[in-house]
């Protein structure tokens, strides 16, 4: 009674429709090593212990005590009678390293006794789900900071132990200053060197030219389109069957590196990374030369694309030392503040000696203004195409009708334009409407003049079309002559004895398709104007200035709010004192 059950596609990896790593077991029904049978039974058994935990990352500054309701889901042969649940909070084994001239050396693995423990009230449990078993209360003052703990809950059922475990990361944001820092701020140092923190590419370049230590936080919207977003959850099925711009297959972290000395992590990450890598782009480090950097946090791209990327790396730029990240370390989360503090502590130390050498020109290949069309005030003459000007590859436009498709992009003022960036639709496995042949014209001296014509290769990658020469204009006419999915002709999928094939539409050969043939299609996710170098630099500086002004306004508002809160607290204390008197 009351059992709802569940359904799995398969227990092992599926071998049809491309490689689909959806199974608990591999294609040969062997363990992948991801989970043991005992771990599987913790959440998939006739009796399961459950804990309602709001977050695996806990900020002690905001939570003096944590309450965790415990529940029992039981569908055994008979109800449970007089069962007592035991719990304990255990510190996970700490791996201690020493760092010297010859790198890191494993010192020891330290196992700690339980930090807290207790027992819940004895109860009976029916054949039902989500039955309340009581509540665990954790006093945060008894728990050491910047550590990962395991909450272990167990009970004895019919002679066997039923148990479940959950990881908990404990931080304290009040002890992790600064949480947010303005561009170019100087992090105080105990050594002769200070660390400068910035998200301003020009300021970063200046500081590096001066030989400084720089933490460069590259904003999402300033990152090259060659650098796709990463994802905490793995890709579903595979990117051949269900392509997306963001793909993920886990992470590799150099967890023994001193940059993580006060930020607990395993080599394959953990739940404390989930919010850190949401809305984050993976930096394509093959553009820099993978041997030139030390890749501290590497997201694993899905194997059909297999980009070599990084979320955090260190290198030398001339005589300067650079730590570069695309992770938003300024977000309001205790794990972000803890990671930032751990990185800064390392950067201030003598251990911060990056080995690889990278030029600023190489680093610049990671930068691109995503919303350049918004910055320019660009408009398109067909409202149905406006989404391709939003700079977001995860939206797209789709036109049907017949080739060629032409549209005009216009800006309020004239600009020196050097080319166009076209990014195809990212989520269609048949590359529907992907541009092949094109014609680009500029409005010059009162007439349309050709500035480029050619063909593109079929790819999900951004395609940058350079003009024959820079043009000074306020209007560009873009014409799609044909696409890869149907080069100039309608097509359809047909079943043949040995499989499915995409064929050019021939109504005489397939009369049943008359009146049902698909129309010629053009699609795009992003179309951006590429500016000449001086124009692009001016736009960069304008947006950075606007960002700093916005940050300053936010700081003023936050300071005012803090002051108001202090005044309210003071008023309440005064009122309480008057009442007491």
Regions found by a protein language model. Give the residues of each.
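Substrate-binding clefts and catalytic carboxylate motifs of secreted carbohydrate-active enzymes
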Residues: 1-91, 95-102
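Short beta-strand-plus-loop segments that form exposed binding edges in beta-rich domains
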Residues: 479-486
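Catalytic beta-strand/loop cores that center a nucleophilic Ser/Cys/Thr
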Residues: 223-224, 237-335, 351-357, 366-368, ...
